[in-house]
């Protein structure tokens, strides 16, 4: 009888300690921040449906967002002002934490990879 009770306790202990998987879908909507970094100011991002609005350095840009899967998406300026604004920005999520993710961004077909962190502030 003691063995059965011990087995039940152990099973309950192991199943209750199971960590919930991190769901990347929560990064598809809400308000986010990219902290200030070397060469760029803090950026505030609001995502709704297929639109992303970015506010930085007293500028506001509106981009369409197209998700390839939970870890890759493409941004495209809706009203490009320069030739470089016409190129799509390909984003790859490289690591997910509780309320943030690390990413790599490539503009167009460039070989330059910009790395950064996006932090979720609210839904």
Identify what each model region corresponds to:
Residues 40-68:
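N-terminal glycine/threonine-rich, aromatic-flanked beta-hairpin/loop signature
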Residues 24-39:
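Tryptophan-anchored aromatic micro-motifs
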Residues 1-4:
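Positively charged n-region of N-terminal signal peptides that target proteins for export
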Residues 43-45, 62-66, 88-94, 116-120:
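Hydrophobic/aromatic beta-strand elements that line small-molecule binding cavities or substrate pockets
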Residues 108-123:
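Edge beta-strand at a domain terminus
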């Amino acid at each position: 009888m003691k063995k059965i009770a011990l087995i039940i306790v152990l099973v309950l202990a192991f199943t209750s300690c199971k960590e919930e998987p991190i769901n990347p879908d929560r990064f598809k909507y809400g308000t986010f921040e990219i902290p200030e970094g070397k060469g760029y100011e803090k950026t505030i991002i609001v995502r709704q449906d297929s639109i992303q609005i970015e506010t930085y350095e007293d500028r506001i840009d509106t981009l369409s967002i197209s998700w390839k899967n939970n870890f890759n998406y493409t941004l495209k300026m809706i009203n490009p002002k320069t030739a470089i604004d016409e190129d799509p920005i390909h984003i790859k999520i490289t690591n997910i934490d509780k309320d943030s993710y690390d990413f790599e961004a490539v503009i167009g077909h460039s070989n330059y990879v910009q790395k950064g962190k996006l932090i979720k502030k609210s839904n």
